[in-house]
Design a protein with these regions (language model features):
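N-terminal maturation segment of proteins
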Residues: 1-179
Length: 179
């Protein structure tokens, strides 16, 4: 909780975009571990996909607020995330294939559910295209040329990833010795 409060105070959510672990990936990755054995599982997936456009709209608005406050991610990260998004939103990308190959462990999906899933997957693709266009036309032009965010930001990110505080200097020195 302390870390979350520190991150909020540092406004890291206003520039939360990178190529590894940010909402751009998390919103898509949420489907990776969802159960797919039954028609009910696929119905839940479809409902969650129907909410994806609103989630992406909210994410875009958060990044816009960062732009207003001049708290922006690195341009290199923005450009690479645009490339990642193409793999999600392409007609042969994640959402299209996921919906096209949807099937319970036994039998077939009801036709109405298959259509709903297809429609919601298409809406998710369009939402990701909207995100890519925002990144390309609005965020990339004002994004930072500087990678990273300095020692304090790195220390917070490290604590979040590890779940513990580490001595960054000691860790760096250890890495040099291990070469």
């Amino acid at each position: 909780l302390t870390l979350m409060l520190e991150q909020h105070a540092a406004k890291t959510h206003l520039r939360d975009l990178n190529v590894i672990e940010s909402p751009a990936q998390q919103l898509r990755a949420a489907y990776d571990l969802m159960p797919t054995d039954t028609a009910e599982d696929w119905s839940i997936i479809s409902r969650r996909m129907s909410a994806l456009p609103a989630a992406i709209d909210g994410y875009i608005e958060t990044l816009r607020e960062g732009m207003r406050q001049q708290i922006v991610p690195a341009r290199r990260q923005v450009v690479e995330v645009i490339t990642q998004i193409a793999r999600y939103s392409d007609k042969g990308g994640f959402f299209a294939v996921f919906a096209a190959e949807a099937a319970p462990a036994e039998g077939e999906l009801p036709a109405t559910l298959a259509r709903e899933l297809h429609d919601n997957a298409n809406a998710a693709r369009v939402a990701y295209d909207t995100l890519a266009e925002f990144l390309r036309s609005e965020l990339a032009p004002v994004a930072s040329e500087q990678d990273g965010g300095g020692r304090e930001q790195y220390a917070r990110a490290s604590r979040g990833f590890l779940g513990a505080t580490s001595d960054l200097g000691e860790t760096y020195e250890w890495r040099l010795r291990e070469r």
